[in-house]
Amino acid sequence: MAVVERDSDYYDSSYLADYYESLWTDHAALEDIAVYWAFFKERVLLSQSRVDSKFFLLDVGTGTGRVLHSLIDKAVNDADMSLDAMQFVGMDKSPFMLEQAQRAKQLPQEVRASWFVGTATALEDIASLADPHGKANLLIFAFSGINHLHQPGEIDQFFLSARRVLLPGGLALVSVCAPLLDIEGGDSVPNPYGQVKEVKSKRLEGILYREWETGQKIEGHLFTNSLKTDVVQVSQDGSERVIERNIHNIPLTLLTRDGLRRSAAAAKLEIIEERCIRDEVIFALRAVG
């Protein structure tokens, strides 16, 4: 029986959200949590030293909550940090990803965490749902999420929206895919997400995910990565059956430091630091005024 193929925007099914969770949550190649934790703790301690010690963290494109859950785990186990005044908000455009985020871990009772469907270009909608009178002390847009903003004007809209939800002096931490930053000519780039991946589901017994690249192209400021992802059911005797095949054509924006600086400055955000880790550059931007 032929496998039915479906066009996918990558995380638009429960299986694909589970694949993401199974692949990336504890992936050894990801080194970003240490960077986010350092900025997060510094900002929280600064906030706790003030009369109004309320702290609001907004995680944009939270996915299955990898970054948010990791920071909460560290905060719970840090004697210097008080969770009483903290509020954690995770936002993603995929309800399937948020479903995974909400059930990924049992949060301690004292942790206030909320999850919302939304977009990176209308963050003020999410912030108002979470706290009508509050603004964010810290905003995180992790795992090269900004590269996925590929429609005309979307990156400018993101920065403007980020500034609206940040407190004056608040901080945004924005991850950019290093292989897609400051590209000088050429018609190909290294696949930013690696080659063939095969991973067992952490939650669904007998389910295996297998993904491979089928092509790539560069047109103007866009790099399109084409992939196929199979959802495979593995029987006890080891035989396999593909139960879902997903076809992805993922447009990613090629970015430059100068372009990011201009877009940020137009939104009254100032790049104050950048941290280079494996396959990522994390920019720290401060809300001016």
From Swiss-Prot:
InterPro entries: Methyltransf_25 (IPR041698), SAM-dependent_MTases_sf (IPR029063). Its EC number is 2.1.1.-. It is an enzyme of class 2 (transferase). The keyword Transferase applies. It comes from the Eukaryota. The keyword Transferase applies. Pathway: Secondary metabolite biosynthesis. Keywords: Methyltransferase, Transferase. It catalyses: (1S,4S)-4-[(4-hydroxyphenyl)methyl]-2,5-diazaspiro[bicyclo[3.2.1]octane-6,1'-cyclohexan]-4'-one + S-adenosyl-L-methionine = (1S,4S)-4-[(4-hydroxyphenyl)methyl]-2-methyl-2,5-diazaspiro[bicyclo[3.2.1]octane-6,1'-cyclohexan]-4'-one + S-adenosyl-L-homocysteine + H(+); (1S,4S)-4-[(4-methoxyphenyl)methyl]-2,5-diazaspiro[bicyclo[3.2.1]octane-6,1'-cyclohexan]-4'-one + S-adenosyl-L-methionine = (1S,4S)-4-[(4-methoxyphenyl)methyl]-2-methyl-2,5-diazaspiro[bicyclo[3.2.1]octane-6,1'-cyclohexan]-4'-one + S-adenosyl-L-homocysteine + H(+). N-methyltransferase; part of the gene cluster that mediates the biosynthesis of the alkaloid (-)-FR901483, a potent immunosuppressant that shows efficacy in animal models and a probable inhibitor of purine nucleotide biosynthesis by targeting phosphoribosylpyrophosphate amidotransferase (PPAT). Within the pathway, FrzE methylates the amine at position C10'. The biosynthesis of (-)-FR901483 starts with the condensation of two L-tyrosines to yield (S,S)-dityrosyl-piperazine. Belongs to the methyltransferase superfamily. This is N-methyltransferase FrzE. The gene is FrzE.
